[in-house]
Amino acid sequence: MEYGFKAAGLVFVVLLLQQAPVLIRATDADPLQDFCVADLNSEVTVNGHACKPASAAGDEFLFSSKIATGGDVNANPNGSNVTELDVAEWPGVNTLGVSMNRVDFAPGGTNPPHVHPRATEVGIVLRGELLVGIIGTLDTGNRYYSKVVRAGETFVIPRGLMHFQFNVGKTEATMVVSFNSQNPGIVFVPLTLFGSNPPIPTPVLVKALRVDAGVVELLKSKFTGGY
């Protein structure tokens, strides 16, 4: 009987180890062909986009100039502009597990506290100086890490951690960031709490934030139009 229990235990451990690669996978799935240019008009989506026929994909899918110039940093109250280059904007990165953003900041502009649930982020400041802040999980006591990053310097944001960038300089600033996902996703914390559709019930936020209903309603009014 003892031998039987030991054998059963060994089988369980082997099966568990076989699943380990699945459990620890933290990036997009590996590609199974040289390229798979996304067909953004296809109605077929299986955790990604269907491929265009190879004959319909010219070499232009390898190149993009969309982040060569930035947008209007004064177009929103944040004082920043994000030029996205994910699979929706650059179909050539479909299945390749990469994407990029360019972010331009007015003096005092911010990329508000947010999370990328599906990707690690690495970035370089091209001009100006940015305060980069990262907030750890409850495991670290919600520790706050920060540093002023200047032109030519780099930073990394672990996957899923809340973070922000803030232009502490007197001139405009620009950074370029890359992700290990074709679609890293983004969750803006203020917009998520106060601009969700439909809205989060006010009593929930009153209890969670420990403020009165008037404060919650005021904050909701600030995000009715999104960012």
Swiss-Prot record:
Glycans are attached at residues 78, 81. Residues 1-29 form the signal peptide. It is found in: Secreted, Extracellular space, Apoplast. Pfam families: Cupin_1. It comes from the Eukaryota. Residues 65-217 form the Cupin type-1 domain. PROSITE patterns: GERMIN. Mn(2+) binds at residues 114, 116, 121, 163. Keywords: Apoplast, Disulfide bond, Glycoprotein, Manganese, Metal-binding, Secreted, Signal. GO terms for molecular function: manganese ion binding. Disulfide bonds join 36-51. Its main location: secreted. CDD domains: cupin_OxOx. SUPFAM superfamilies: RmlC-like cupins. GO terms for cellular component: apoplast. Oligomer (believed to be a pentamer but probably hexamer). PANTHER family: GERMIN-LIKE PROTEIN SUBFAMILY 3 MEMBER 3. Belongs to the germin family. May play a role in plant defense. Probably has no oxalate oxidase activity even if the active site is conserved. This is Germin-like protein 3-5. The lineage of its organism: Eukaryota, Viridiplantae, Streptophyta, Embryophyta, Tracheophyta.
